[in-house]
């Protein structure tokens, strides 16, 4: 079978062409979004107008039919032009793609959700940071569902989202468990804090969100799991999500390389540094393409070993992207140290890569524990 990594290179170009066409507009806006710490709202409007938010949904459900590899290619292209837009779009796309994985296996809830997203070109935002294994917040059972109070962080794309995907802890008769659910972002009791003022990725709008007595209908709950332990659902989410997220940063590194090559024109003494930078980008690209190959357009069978392999490749890509961008910055030199130069912004945006699960040291422990036959996460 032809691998998805190879298929990505020869995919029907329509979606990446669209991303490239609007990417020039996004690049022109990027400096202002970064300077103001302002959410990329106009870019989201352009993405919606071109139905990119439903691109990864199968055509039979009303979407654009882009494969997992093609979604990664879209994100990579957006990342070349505006890191904040690429990352925000990635954070919308990965829960969509996780639902595609479930849809092709007959999950009726996932199918229904995808149809609704495609019909309305809905945008998703979910929680990040450490809000996954342990979760946070409290869900109290009430008539017809739950009442949730929580403080959620790193909600990328929140200001432009229609749906909020998150979780909370429900302490029922059988003990505490985490419930996962999606609710409209406009639900009563949801308040976006407007506190995203960061080093990099300043246009993602990844603000904190306060949930105060938010009603979650019982039918909105899509999963339940124990608190603080590894659950098989992550063996779907992690392999599907990480190649999409990594694609943004590989695109960012490719953008940095373009500025470096432009700066090094006519300077043969820069050849060794250019070669080093290209090597790092090659390593990051190989890691990304192998992640996409592993997912195989949703044909993979979830397993801890696959999750570990994908996490290892994410760590390799992160290290290589960081090295490539730092070298590119050295090649560009002093001009790239000034505010307003794209290289200065790219250097700061790259710093966000570390924070996506799992940071390298934690990944090494995770993969090492699996190799030793231990549970991937030590009980704490």
Which residues are covered by each model-predicted region?
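Glycine-rich beta->alpha junctions and the first turn(s) of the following alpha-helix
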Residues: 198-282
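Basic/polar N-terminal segments that are highly enriched at the extreme N-terminus
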Residues: 1-17, 379-380
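Glycine-rich flavin
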Residues: 39-49, 53-160
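A short core secondary-structure module
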Residues: 154-192
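Glycine-rich phosphate/pyrophosphate-binding beta-alpha loops
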Residues: 153-158, 242-244, 353-356
